[in-house]
């Protein structure tokens, strides 16, 4: 059984679009802010501050349905001394293998979980400890294909079905909070943790130490921090010292 509330893993996000490190507002590709033209250097910066893991998203891949920034991701994975998890455009067994062979520690499935559950089952059978499913939701309903396509699939229903297929870890993102510096959807995250009783990583709107403390208290295994560490709203080093 998953043990809750002991500590929380704080995971810096590196979102890559056009080879640059960017942040989007609520997942909108038309509302991007470029923070660095050197994603590898950014990864090394977060590692030097004490990051236990890096969360890398291939935004081009998420939109195109295939890995676009593979060479850059490979360079990050090979340069980092900490585990690197990757999402965005991972919709085939071939892409999963390619990323894991390249040194990626964990692959994250999003669209594939909705559109190809048989593939998820096959991936779990071979790489159960190296895969997570990202539940990306608007008003409790799952969005796919780079968050552009809305569905009527309930987030909790998807999580339950993926757990039955062998998924042992989930990432939950409330799209309306992502990139807003508001706050996470604590209620939805709490409900998901209670419903599936496996590790859940929270994402979207995490922007303060108090957010991280509350996420730890409700049982989140980890929290992905994005815009707040780029704007300076969240002091990453202090967060690691206080909560890791």
Curated annotation (Swiss-Prot):
Its EC number is 5.3.1.16. GO terms for cellular component: cytoplasm. Belongs to the HisA/HisF family. It comes from the Bacteria. The keyword Translocase does not apply. It is an enzyme of class 5 (isomerase). PANTHER family: 1-(5-PHOSPHORIBOSYL)-5-[(5-PHOSPHORIBOSYLAMINO)METHYLIDENEAMINO] IMIDAZOLE-4-CARBOXAMIDE ISOMERASE (PTHR43090:SF2). One of its GO terms (molecular function) is 1-(5-phosphoribosyl)-5-[(5-phosphoribosylamino)methylideneamino]imidazole-4-carboxamide isomerase activity. The active site is at 15 (proton acceptor), 136 (proton donor). It is found in: Cytoplasm. It catalyses: 1-(5-phospho-beta-D-ribosyl)-5-[(5-phospho-beta-D-ribosylamino)methylideneamino]imidazole-4-carboxamide = 5-[(5-phospho-1-deoxy-D-ribulos-1-ylimino)methylamino]-1-(5-phospho-beta-D-ribosyl)imidazole-4-carboxamide. Its main location: cytoplasm. It holds the Pfam family His_biosynth. CDD domains: HisA. InterPro entries: Aldolase_TIM, His_biosynth, HisA_bact_arch, Isoase_HisA-like, Isoase_HisA-like_bact, RibuloseP-bd_barrel. The keyword Amino-acid biosynthesis applies. Pathway: Amino-acid biosynthesis; L-histidine biosynthesis; L-histidine from 5-phospho-alpha-D-ribose 1-diphosphate: step 4/9. It comes from Dehalococcoides mccartyi (strain CBDB1). This is 1-(5-phosphoribosyl)-5-[(5-phosphoribosylamino)methylideneamino] imidazole-4-carboxamide isomerase. Keywords: Amino-acid biosynthesis, Cytoplasm, Histidine biosynthesis, Isomerase. GO terms for biological process: L-histidine biosynthetic process; L-tryptophan biosynthetic process.
């Amino acid at each position: 059984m998953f043990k809750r509330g002991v500590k929380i893993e704080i995971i810096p996000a590196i979102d890559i679009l056009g080879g640059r490190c960017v942040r989007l507002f609520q997942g909108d590709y038309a509302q991007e802010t470029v923070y660095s033209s050197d994603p590898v250097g950014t990864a090394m910066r977060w590692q030097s501050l004490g990051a236990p893991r890096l969360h890398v998203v291939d935004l081009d891949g998420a939109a195109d349905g295939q890995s676009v920034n593979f060479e850059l991701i490979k360079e990050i994975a090979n340069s980092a001394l900490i585990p690197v998890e990757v999402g965005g455009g991972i919709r085939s067994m071939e892409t999963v293998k390619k990323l894991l062979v390249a040194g990626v520690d964990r692959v994250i499935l999003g669209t594939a979980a909705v559109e190809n559950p048989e593939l998820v089952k096959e991936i779990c059978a071979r790489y159960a400890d190296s895969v997570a499913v990202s539940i990306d939701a608007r008003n409790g309903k799952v969005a796919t294909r780079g968050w552009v396509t809305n569905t009527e699939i309930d987030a909790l229903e998807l999580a339950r079905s993926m757990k039955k297929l062998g998924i042992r870890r989930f990432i939950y993102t409330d799209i309306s909070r992502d990139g807003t510096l508001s706050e996470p959807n604590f209620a939805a995250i709490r409900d998901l943790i209670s419903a599936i009783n496996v590790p859940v990583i929270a994402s979207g709107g995490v922007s303060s130490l108090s957010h991280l403390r509350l996420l730890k208290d409700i049982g989140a295994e980890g929290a992905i921090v994005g815009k707040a560490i780029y704007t300076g709203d969240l002091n990453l080093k202090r967060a690691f010292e206080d909560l890791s």
